[in-house]
Amino acid sequence: KCVEKNKGLWTDGKVPHRVIPLSPSDAAFLLLPVSDDDFQDAKDLEFPQILGQIQYPTVYTKMEMRFAISLISRQRSRWSRKSFKILVKALEYGYTTRHIGLMYSCGLDQHGVNKLYAYADSNFAAPRSQGCRITMMNGCAISLTSKRHTTTDTSTCEAEATEFFLCTRDVERLRNLMGEIGLFQQEPTIIYQDNMPAIQIMTNRGSLPNRSKAMDIRVMSGRNKVEDKKVLPVYTSTLKMVADLGTKALDEKQFVFLRDLANGYALVRASGANVELPALVIAAAEIGQ
């Protein structure tokens, strides 16, 4: 409906084909301040209206767009013509991939049926790092959050530990909810991370360095959940860190790979199940990378 309403944005009403919602170069541009002249030149464009319409599906089925929307939203009250074009590109991606949503499966997930697990990752940036956490079950995401931390991190380790702490809160809430409906989690919920120092801090009481004292409360809270066997941090390589799609703008190949790991399509594709999948879903030959 958003595309139909704004068909005047494209020549002959034809929407360009987009494979990613946000390119690395566009992401870098959105970090720059908007000048008064640029805003005055673009203030009549319907930036907030279109942004709001795109945000709705990202809450439910287009979770892979969360990082793009998070970054674009920083210019909600002050935008330029260039940032409006970037917003339109995100809309084009959403329209191009409108047939790709979320696909849950039964018996295909290596973690087991109805077993909760999660991914937590963060970049390291000033003034605040961008973190992403994804909780999954039956091969597909059930929640995805991509947003800046509320505090300034002093190292990559601290940024990763902060995101782990935030992820433990999501996991604990979901474990309680699942317990109420009879889906008790008998084992600790795995939280995948790609930073070994952060994992060591969370699993070893003697490994908290002096420069990390400022995050004592978060570390202790996360560590308590590990000791209570509610969560278990597990290392995974950066290439397979699904939450990476919520921390930075990625190239086409890596974005599609992580997107389809998160939305469950890659798992179904790899299983060889006789299921008709959209053409833009990752090819079976690329899953084994």
Roles of regions detected by a PLM:
Residues 1-289:
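Long, low-complexity, charge-biased intrinsically disordered regions
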